[in-house]
Amino acid sequence: MMALLLAGGRSSRARTHKGCRRVEGRPWLYRQCRFLRSQGFAQVRVVLGYSAVGAARCVPPGVRRIWNRNRAGGPFASLRAGLRGARGPVLVVLVDAWLPSPATIYRLRLGLRGAYAAMPVWRGRGGHPALLSHELATAIAGSAHSPKERLDHVLASAGARRIAVQDRSVRRNMNRRRDWWLYLRCRKLRRPLWMG
């Protein structure tokens, strides 16, 4: 099973690439990759786009870096680039999203059985990350690019299985300074981040 981190955006609301923001001395991308490896994802890929050279330094050794040369194509172009050659189910993680709980990842793995995709739902609302079957990942990687294509639309049309989780973090992102502050505050209090 593979994990794919999408980190190709401009980070226009932040001064630096979101993946390079430091959390307790380590870049956020580094922490995300290490967490995913600890959850049994033998292969972790990071898709870079804008600020790729600087962001690549924040990725730990042993993680495959993929450059999305079609940066203007947006997040879906990054997704397609990262999925090429995938050999099994793929967990799609956004660089500006909180990490899910280990229990959420486990439930997504169970929920993928017999489905094209599984996505977490907290209090009736969908969130991240999404787990794609090998068939869906291959179809997305080989699809013709449309500038209006979005993963949530693909998941809906594929009939993604919605998995109820007790993990508020699946709805959280880290787009604004306040979002980072909340994340760091939860870490400092040593509260489980997913209970938020």
Where in the sequence are the language-model features?
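Nucleotide and nucleotide-moiety/phosphate-recognizing core
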Residues: 1-126, 134, 159-167
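Short, solvent-exposed loop/turn segments at secondary-structure boundaries
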Residues: 18, 142-144
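Phosphate- and divalent-cation-binding pockets in alpha/beta enzyme and binding domains
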Residues: 54-55, 107, 139, 173, ...
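Activation segment
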Residues: 101, 140-141, 184
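Conserved nucleotide-sugar donor-binding
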Residues: 127-139, 177
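Conserved alpha/beta core of the MobA/IspD/sugar-nucleotide pyrophosphorylase nucleotidyltransferase superfamily
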Residues: 144-196
